[in-house]
């Protein structure tokens, strides 16, 4: 991907309805846990929190999925697994918040872009959050929240086709998942046959 493609992808992610929706959810949790200081209570406080949560996510997306990947030559895309056990796929989706592919080698490496971008977004949030909460604690807290949002998004990308097929009888992958599962099953069968072959050769005639 070129630098402009990465920034464009980050912008589309930042204005996706999912990003707005998760900001409203985060704002709801924030208001439920707050003591009434800072943003305050009620509709006004809730919408202030929603706006701040969205800015956190927007900054994290643009910096962690756009600017830093362009500078560090890291691929910000999520590469869906689509087959294997639930546990394996879930852990894979979570890990992609902290691991990514390098542009040139295609090998997995620490996702400095995403982690660094989320921390920077957390630091920027001190500019528009109430002064009572500003500081290192706020930076870390908001950085972790943005990281969790991205992790949840990765899990959703991984399992949404499964959910869609189950609930709506629609396959967003147009059969690619079925092909991947078939290939995975064939590989497991071949591995099992290869393991059994030496045992058969050792049996006396």
What role is predicted for each listed range?
Residues 126-136:
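Membrane-helix boundary connector in multi-pass membrane proteins
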């Amino acid at each position: 991907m070129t630098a402009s493609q990465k920034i464009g992808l980050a912008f589309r992610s930042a204005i996706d309805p999912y990003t707005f929706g998760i900001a409203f959810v985060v704002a709801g949790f924030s208001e439920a846990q707050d003591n009434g200081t800072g943003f305050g209570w009620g509709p006004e406080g809730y919408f202030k929190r929603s706006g701040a949560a969205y800015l956190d996510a927007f900054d994290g997306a643009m910096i962690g999925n756009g600017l830093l990947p362009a500078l560090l030559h890291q691929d910000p895309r999520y590469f869906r697994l689509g087959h294997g056990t639930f546990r394996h796929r879930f852990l894979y989706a979570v890990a992609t918040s902290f691991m990514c592919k390098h542009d040139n080698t295609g090998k997995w490496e620490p996702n400095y872009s995403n982690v660094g971008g989320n921390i920077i977004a957390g630091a920027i949030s001190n500019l528009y959050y109430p002064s009572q909460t500003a500081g290192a604690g706020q930076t870390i807290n908001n950085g972790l929240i943005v990281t969790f949002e991205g992790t949840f998004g990765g899990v959703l990308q991984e399992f949404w086709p499964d959910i869609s097929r189950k609930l709506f009888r629609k396959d967003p992958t147009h059969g690619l998942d079925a092909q991947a599962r078939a290939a995975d099953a064939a590989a497991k069968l071949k591995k099992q046959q290869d393991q059994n072959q030496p045992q058969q050769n050792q049996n006396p005639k």
